[in-house]
């Protein structure tokens, strides 16, 4: 269950906005602030040294998995939300989809969205 957006809200947004208008984002932020009382066991939020929420540890693969789990989105939809839709929104026409002339930035996953390989500008990352 998400902290930022309730699964019921995810389903509503998908139904109202449609797949072409959903963009997944991630702070993927690391912090070493102390965990304030009442948040014991919460593993996906970072806190600053004042005890305020400083960001999320959520990564895009987990965001994609959450959308698939909570909304019934397909793996194709999940990649659309994480790559194609953001590229279009930012008018980055050289990326976001696999096509001739596009940048070869690829994330290869298994059917459960576990990352297997990352290719950046045509080069496989270690």
Regions found by a protein language model. Give the residues of each.
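Secondary-structure boundary/capping motif
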Residues: 5-6
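Short, Lys/Arg- and Gly-enriched loop/turn segments at beta-strand edges
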Residues: 113-119
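His/Asp/Glu-enriched, well-ordered alpha-helical/loop segment
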Residues: 9, 14-109
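Active-site beta-loop-alpha junctions enriched in small/polar residues
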Residues: 1-2, 29
């Amino acid at each position: 269950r998400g902290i930022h957006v309730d699964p019921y809200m995810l389903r509503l947004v998908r139904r109202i906005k449609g797949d072409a208008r959903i963009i997944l984002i991630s702070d993927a932020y690391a912090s070493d602030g102390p965990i304030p009382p009442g948040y014991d066991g919460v593993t996906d939020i970072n806190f600053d040294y004042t005890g305020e929420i400083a960001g999320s540890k959520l990564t895009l693969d987990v965001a994609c998995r959450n959308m698939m789990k909570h909304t019934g989105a397909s793996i194709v939809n999940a990649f659309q939300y994480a790559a194609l839709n953001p590229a279009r929104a930012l008018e980055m026409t050289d990326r976001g989809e696999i096509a001739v002339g596009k940048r070869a930035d690829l994330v290869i996953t298994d059917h459960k969205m576990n990352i297997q390989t990352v290719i950046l500008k045509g080069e496989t990352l270690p």
